[in-house]
């Protein structure tokens, strides 16, 4: 048999196996819906981490019998579990959510076409009937509009997979009396935008917010002759390009923004990392009470005493209560350079006995502690086998 023919036969067999895999995944998803309905009826938690661990261990053991690496099985089924949890969360949210009948007003760093604008619409689409937008010029203005009852929700970016934490937002969280009530992750695809299609060497000036420049630094370094101009947001950069009407100007911005402002996309996906994701938080005047059935994040900020080992004592309390820490960030305190403020995300419902017990202990060993909010986790923490 010619080599080409045998290759086609093998590929055809793989295609048939892939079709079976997709069909089985669809069957699995149908069962997930039934499981979710049963959990809702019986008031059971969506996620059972102990069961997930046992299931994964059994699958790894089975995989070894078929000469499949444990890492491969782990990554594959963590993705399947994540999809399963997300499906159940959506169904429970639909069952519990009465907000779909009302509109909501969102403040964000504008103008239209900014990533904050995209995040506001994505969150509103999942939770409300309609999104009414309120464009702001600074993060502080975004928060003030909600504090002053001019808007219902503040949308703020808090961290990015390329450029890390957004310190300005952490500073605001220390001062505001608003609460985090939700989060949403947005895939960030920075594009090089111009008035019309031109050669890269014709560009003289490039506009954008400082974050995209940081996230696309590898690309920007290739053009040291370009003059960099910082703007209040990516949408503000696109707006300026349109207003100035100069073909030698360019901007880093979103594809949606390019359509809003009538700009051409010269190059796509310019970030240093492929998976460039920004996590946004939603703030409201009132804290949110979350069903114990839903995977939840509780966020705190605190300062410890200056004695050695203060932070490790806090972390030991979390470990003692078997609470999963999703994120820990530290910041120097202005005017007190020897002290630090810690921001921590914990995978737990604030109302749980474990968290309340942990809080009582943490309060005794910290100089300052503030609960920023308790809210549904958009992305679940992967389990370890």
UniProtKB/Swiss-Prot annotation:
Residues 1-92 form the Chorismate mutase domain. One of its GO terms (molecular function) is chorismate mutase activity. Residues 299-376 form the ACT domain. Its main location: cytoplasm. GO terms for biological process: chorismate metabolic process; L-phenylalanine biosynthetic process. CDD domains: ACT_CM-PDT, PBP2_Ct-PDT_like. Keywords: Allosteric enzyme, Amino-acid biosynthesis, Aromatic amino acid biosynthesis, Cytoplasm, Isomerase, Lyase, Multifunctional enzyme, Phenylalanine biosynthesis. It catalyses: chorismate = prephenate; prephenate + H(+) = 3-phenylpyruvate + CO2 + H2O. GO terms for cellular component: cytoplasm. Residues 105-285 form the Prephenate dehydratase domain. Substrate binds at residues 11, 28, 39, 48, 52, 84, 88. The keyword Cytoplasm applies. The keyword Amino-acid biosynthesis applies. Pathway: Amino-acid biosynthesis; L-phenylalanine biosynthesis; phenylpyruvate from prephenate: step 1/1; Metabolic intermediate biosynthesis; prephenate biosynthesis; prephenate from chorismate: step 1/1. Residues 286-385 are annotated as: Regulatory. InterPro entries: ACT-like_dom_sf, ACT_dom, Chor_mutase/pphenate_deHydtase, Chorismate_II_sf, CM_dom_sf, CM_II_prokaryot, CM_P_1, Preph_deHydtase. Coiled coil: none annotated. The record marks 278 as: Essential for prephenate dehydratase activity. Its EC number is 5.4.99.5, 4.2.1.51. It is found in: Cytoplasm. It comes from the Bacteria. Catalyzes the Claisen rearrangement of chorismate to prephenate and the decarboxylation/dehydration of prephenate to phenylpyruvate. The regulatory domain shows changes in the ESRP sequence, which is involved in the allosteric binding of phenylalanine. These changes suggest the desensitization of the enzyme to inhibition by phenylalanine and would permit the overproduction of phenylalanine. This is Bifunctional chorismate mutase/prephenate dehydratase. It comes from Buchnera aphidicola subsp. Acyrthosiphon pisum (strain APS).
């Amino acid at each position: 048999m010619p080599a080409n023919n045998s290759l086609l036969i093998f590929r055809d067999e793989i295609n048939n196996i892939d079709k079976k895999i997709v069909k089985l995944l669809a069957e699995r998803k149908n069962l997930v819906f039934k499981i979710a309905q049963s959990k809702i009826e019986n008031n059971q938690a969506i996620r059972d981490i102990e069961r997930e661990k046992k299931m994964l261990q059994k699958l790894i053991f089975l995989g070894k019998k078929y000469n499949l690496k444990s890492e491969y099985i782990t990554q594959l089924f963590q993705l399947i579990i994540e999809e399963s949890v997300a499906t159940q969360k959506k169904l429970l949210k639909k069952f519990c959510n009465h907000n779909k009948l009302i509109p909501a007003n969102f403040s964000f760093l504008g103008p239209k076409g900014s990533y904050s604008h995209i995040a506001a619409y994505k969150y509103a689409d999942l939770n409300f009937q309609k999104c009414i937008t309120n464009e702001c010029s600074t993060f502080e203005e975004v928060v003030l509009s909600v504090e002053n009852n001019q808007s219902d929700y503040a949308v703020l970016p808090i961290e990015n997979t390329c450029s890390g934490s957004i310190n300005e937002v952490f500073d605001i969280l220390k001062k505001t009396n608003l609460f985090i009530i939700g989060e949403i992750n947005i895939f960030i695809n920075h594009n090089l935008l111009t008035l019309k299609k031109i050669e890269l060497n014709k560009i003289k000036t490039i506009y954008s917010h400082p974050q995209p420049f940081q996230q696309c630094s590898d690309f920007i370094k290739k053009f040291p002759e370009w003059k960099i101009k910082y703007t209040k947001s990516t949408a503000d950069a696109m707006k300026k390009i349109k207003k100035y009407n100069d073909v030698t100007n360019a901007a880093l911005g979103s594809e949606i923004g390019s359509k809003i402002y009538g700009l051409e996309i010269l190059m796509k996906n310019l970030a240093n990392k492929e998976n460039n994701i920004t996590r946004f938080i939603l703030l409201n005047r009132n804290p949110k009470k979350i069903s114990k059935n839903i995977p939840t994040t509780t966020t705190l900020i605190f300062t410890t005493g200056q004695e050695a080992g203060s932070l490790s004592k806090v972390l030991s309390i979390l470990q003692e209560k078997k609470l999963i820490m999703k994120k820990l960030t530290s910041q120097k305190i202005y005017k007190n350079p020897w002290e630090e403020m810690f921001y921590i995300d914990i995978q737990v419902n604030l109302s749980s006995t474990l968290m309340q017990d942990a809080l009582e202990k943490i309060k005794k060993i910290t100089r300052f502690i503030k609960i920023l909010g308790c809210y549904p986790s958009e992305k679940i923490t992967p389990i370890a086998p």
